Amino acid sequence: MLSKRSDKELSGRSCSCDELITLVAERMNRCAPFACFRLPGEGCAVHEIGLQHEARAVATTARELREREHLAGFLMAPFVVTAETPMLWIEEEQKEQGASVLELATCDEAELESFPPVAPIPQALPDSYRVTFARFIEHLEEGMAEKLVLAHRAELPSIATAQVVGAFDKALTHYPNAFVSLCYTPQSGLWLCATPEMLLRGDGMRWQTVALAGTMPRQRDGEPPLWSEKNRREHRYVQRFIGELLEQEGIPYRTLAVETTTTGLLQHLQARFALQLPEGYAPITLAERLHPTPAICGTPQRVAQRLILEEESAERSYYAGFLGWYEPERCVDLFVQIRCLQLLPEQSLRLYAGGGIVRGSSLESEWQEVLHKLSAIHSLIR
């Protein structure tokens, strides 16, 4: 385990939820980029960049990040880089070491309840999902891949920016062990994320990544989860992929025991990898090699990614990409962007979720898993 930030590092000025709503609205009205995020286990200590001081957002590449020195900023990468969805880098115009910290006070529930209720998630299985599922099964049975992750997005009308900020605040308490972020750039729009899945974390000496896969609804207290063979197989794919990649890269590691982790309404299987990066090895290089893992893409990695791009009916954009703080000389905290939503320019909401498909997968069971995942993020705003 990496150590948490020290009390001194986490000390910052207090900020009410109303003040955060005002700051976010003002920045978005000016198309001014910002990111605020809470690391797992850090309560309501919210790191921010661009809210108290001016920041800029630029398109970048892993190569550019490797070549620059003294980096300190927020990184948001898409599932696949395109002209419309570049890798984005947010940094303050007047550079200071690290991000500022806000101690966020809880939102006024009565004020948030004054907004119209958010529309429910459509429950009917859409034809687009049914068709792509059938195509994925064909590819799996033909032996082109062992696993393919099928994504779905649900669009809901009429939501206020304040409700998304309120959902961010709610996620801080409902998802204490998740990476929770609220990020805006003119290129990407506003994204809220409450993800359980780490991509890469480290402080220069100690590094770790995680194999996280398999999903089931949270069990009642005291009841041990009964993981299906399908879930265990999905998790083994991720474990195998990470282990083989680390060996190829010449990175020493050890794997910790598989355990069940709970985030909000859902449980997952996870196994942590403790790493030692060789001297001169840039963290962004490993992040780039790991992404996209079988947990959000499939296996083999590049074959699965190609099939997803060919078959899925809607683009993933920044869903199933990765994001977080990147300051390689001091600390790196990168996470996979799942359990997320996007506020669209017309104030409608787009929720994203996906599930792993293997040979023998059931269409109805997979659709129910997608609904469970959509409900997990939807529960923060309804």
Give the label of every model feature segment.
Residues G73-M76, L148, V180-C183, R316-G324:
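A short glycine-rich, hydrophobically flanked beta-strand micro-motif that places a catalytic Asp/Glu
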Residues G143, L200, R240, A304, ...:
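Residue-level signal for inorganic ion chemistry
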Residues L51-S158, A162-Q163, E223, E229, ...:
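Non-catalytic accessory segments adjacent to catalytic cores
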Residues M1-A57, A154-T161, V165:
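Short Lys/Arg-enriched alpha/beta "domain-start" segment
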Residues L277-R382:
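Conserved hydrophobic core element of enzyme catalytic domains
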Residues K95-D127, F133-A134, L156-P157, V210-E310, ...:
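Contiguous alpha-helical scaffold segments within structured protein domains
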Residues M28-E48, P157-Y237, Q270, R330-G354:
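An anion-binding catalytic pocket shared by soluble metabolic enzymes
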